[in-house]
Swiss-Prot record:
Gene3D superfamilies per UniProt: 3.30.1370.30, 3.30.1490.10
Record's protein name: Small ribosomal subunit protein uS8
Source domain of life: Bacteria
Source organism of this protein record: Nitratidesulfovibrio vulgaris (strain DSM 19637 / Miyazaki F)
A Gene Ontology cellular-component term: ribonucleoprotein complex
GO biological process: translation
Family to which this protein belongs: Belongs to the universal ribosomal protein uS8 family.
Presence of keyword DNA-binding: no
NCBIfam families assigned: PRK00136.1
Reported function: One of the primary rRNA binding proteins, it binds directly to 16S rRNA central domain where it helps coordinate assembly of the platform of the 30S subunit.
GO molecular function, one term: rRNA binding
Length: 126
């Protein structure tokens, strides 16, 4: 049993990128589907296909290099990190995104800032 399924998802994406795989499968959950949808919307992955028990993520490359150069889990099961709408960080001086779990659902940092909602800072991607 996994204690942190979101960290497992990010690690699978990181490892697949380093091995130059075209796609990666992760066990399915609603929050992981939301995170994958945000990654697709922001242009970090090619496509997301949801099957019965897993999510297939098609990875994106540019000139043979992974589009995602870094992933970081911020809020962990042992230490949760919450931010207000005015404290949402800019990742890599605006070149990356952060993903938050808010009362309005899972949102990218820019969406949360626009809606003026804070929440749990799940991860940073750049």
């Amino acid at each position: 049993m996994l204690t942190d399924p979101i960290a497992d998802m990010l690690t699978r994406i990181r490892n697949a990128h380093l091995a130059l795989h075209k796609e990666v499968s992760v066990p399915r959950s609603k929050i992981k589907e939301s995170i994958a949808a945000i990654l697709k919307q922001e242009g970090y992955i090619e496509d997301v296909a949801t099957e019965e028990a897993e999510i297939k993520i098609s990875l994106k490359y540019f000139k043979g290099k992974p589009v995602i150069s870094g992933l970081k889990r911020v809020s962990k099961p042992g230490r949760r990190v919450y931010v207000g709408s005015t404290d949402i960080p800019k990742v890599q001086n605006g070149l990356g995104i952060c993903i938050l779990s808010t009362s309005s659902g899972v949102l990218a940092g820019t969406q949360a800032r626009d809606r003026k909602v804070g929440g749990e800072l799940l991860c940073e991607i750049w």
